[in-house]
């Protein structure tokens, strides 16, 4: 079970949004590379990065900030937001990314996701972001008719390394992860699930290590870490103990 600290990039800065609204951005660090280094020094094993501008633009916008992060940390980094082609995937992996997250393109062009999984085994994750149970795309600006489980099942056997499941209605508001929906998704597919959206306190960390959450690969935390609601040392110790 891995706790992924999140760096969301908007205009080159480390921010957190509320319910996915770009107008509701709180700046936590104007130096994302320094934040990445701080997370590494706190003992985190991975880093979750999202190019928020890129998610809306359909192409990488905060590339310079991502490259600075890659230079600042030795931890593996997964990146999502605006990555929509094999060429973009390959370019980012060549720059040192450990994993690329495909969101909108997983809905629009699932064949590309399967091709990417074949070409870059173990390097492709699918981001499934749901609002009211339906998958949202284009930086959460549009909602499709697909449910999270329907989309996830399309990629069974494709070689997807993980599915990052975000409940948009919980994102950035510190109300706790939607464990019922997340565990239901984990039970519906064999692909490892990473929970995202709403992780609020140490109670969520304690929830992560319960037996019914055993299928989860981990969870992503943003605002709760930045606001000090989760103690990194205590959280990581709890997760390490659960893995032992």
Curated annotation (Swiss-Prot):
EC no.? 5.3.1.16
The molecular function terms of the Gene Ontology recorded here are: 1-(5-phosphoribosyl)-5-[(5-phosphoribosylamino)methylideneamino]imidazole-4-carboxamide isomerase activity
Task: Tell me where it resides.
Answer: Cytoplasm
Keyword annotations for this protein, in alphabetical order, are:
Amino-acid biosynthesis, Cytoplasm, Histidine biosynthesis, Isomerase
Major localization class: cytoplasm
Q: Which GO terms are recorded in the biological process aspect for this UniProt protein?
A: L-histidine biosynthetic process; L-tryptophan biosynthetic process
Which residues of this protein are catalytic? 8 (proton acceptor), 129 (proton donor)
Q: Which residues form a coiled coil?
A: none
| InterPro entries listed in its UniProt record | Aldolase_TIM (IPR013785), His_biosynth (IPR006062), HisA_bact_arch (IPR006063), Isoase_HisA-like (IPR044524), Isoase_HisA-like_bact (IPR023016), RibuloseP-bd_barrel (IPR011060)
User: Which Pfam families would you find in this protein's record?
Assistant: His_biosynth
Q: GO cellular-component terms in the record?
A: cytoplasm
Q: Under which pathway is this protein filed?
A: Amino-acid biosynthesis; L-histidine biosynthesis; L-histidine from 5-phospho-alpha-D-ribose 1-diphosphate: step 4/9
Check the record and name the SUPFAM superfamilies matching this protein. Ribulose-phoshate binding barrel
| Reaction(s) catalysed (UniProt annotation) | 1-(5-phospho-beta-D-ribosyl)-5-[(5-phospho-beta-D-ribosylamino)methylideneamino]imidazole-4-carboxamide = 5-[(5-phospho-1-deoxy-D-ribulos-1-ylimino)methylamino]-1-(5-phospho-beta-D-ribosyl)imidazole-4-carboxamide
Keyword Isomerase assigned to the entry: answer is yes
Q: Where are the transmembrane segments?
A: none
Entry's NCBIfam families? 1-(5-phosphoribosyl)-5-[(5-phosphoribosylamino)methylideneamino]imidazole-4-carboxamide isomerase
Q: Which family does it belong to?
A: Belongs to the HisA/HisF family.
Q: What is this protein called?
A: 1-(5-phosphoribosyl)-5-[(5-phosphoribosylamino)methylideneamino] imidazole-4-carboxamide isomerase
Q: What is the lineage of its organism?
A: Bacteria, Pseudomonadati, Pseudomonadota, Alphaproteobacteria, Hyphomicrobiales
User: Gene that codes for this?
Assistant: hisA
